Amino acid sequence: MAATLSRLDISVDGVSVTYNNARLALYNATCTVEPGTITALVGPNGSGKSTLFKSIMGFLQPSQGRVRIGGFSVQKAQKQQLMAYVPQADEVDWNFPVSVFDVVMMGRYGYMNVLRIPSAKDRRLVMESLERVGMVKYRDRQIGELSGGQKKRAFLARALAQEGKVILLDEPFTGVDVKTEKGMIDLLMELRDEGHTILISTHDLASISTFCDHTILLNRTILAQGKTEETFTKENLELTFGGLPMLSLNQMFESTEVDA
């Protein structure tokens, strides 16, 4: 059955993940990403953010618990191309001999037959996606020749070409200049207004309150979640980050107030 919902939520229910070395990466994580919103996933390095992302995308099988996308299992959501993923830079082989156009076309693979011959619609959507992220002039460039911000925009274009209603972005602002970050944030807000559900993992705490509707705080388990103005507090951040000095948190909040 094809998904008929125009807006899809992400439901994570009691998810735990244990790696082969018996290390517990995620414990009893329960949270909801509301449909048609931008939600920030925040936590220190090693807190399980990427593990949670990979569990939602179906790249990892939880040892317990389940994930649902708009009420669908992850497997059904994958088959229906409901989800798109923008990975961290270190997950990509930048030496692989593919062009930007080829990378964005990969977002259409789920709609093609085994021969992977692009249709006119596939090519049109790829070009429209490149246009939307401002990367048309780089379409023939080898992916490894791009700057950090251009690489992120290329993979965001791939997510757009895939036409997934749910978009996950893992640290999309790392290695990106301020202008590129603002452009990406503006586009994410447009996508939200169009009905996309967006989950974004980020270390850029200062910008979260400017564009994220909700925030989830994670450190091996979910510590707090809710509307950003209610959840993104110094007290909750101290709980999440542990030893992060109060001075750093004060500076971050002062920076946010000035930028706003």
Swiss-Prot record:
InterPro entries: AAA+_ATPase, ABC_transporter-like_ATP-bd, ABC_transporter-like_CS, Metal_Ion_Import_ABC, P-loop_NTPase. Pfam families: ABC_tran. GO terms for molecular function: ATP binding; ATP hydrolysis activity; ATPase-coupled transmembrane transporter activity. ATP binds at G43, P44, N45, G46, S47, G48, K49, S50. Keywords: ATP-binding, Manganese, Nucleotide-binding, Transport. GO terms for cellular component: ATP-binding cassette (ABC) transporter complex. Residues 10-245 form the ABC transporter domain. Belongs to the ABC transporter superfamily. PANTHER family: IRON TRANSPORT SYSTEM ATP-BINDING PROTEIN HI_0361-RELATED (PTHR42734:SF5), METAL TRANSPORT SYSTEM ATP-BINDING PROTEIN TM_0124-RELATED (PTHR42734). Part of an ATP-driven transport system for manganese. This is Manganese transport system ATP-binding protein MntA. It comes from Synechocystis sp. (strain ATCC 27184 / PCC 6803 / Kazusa).
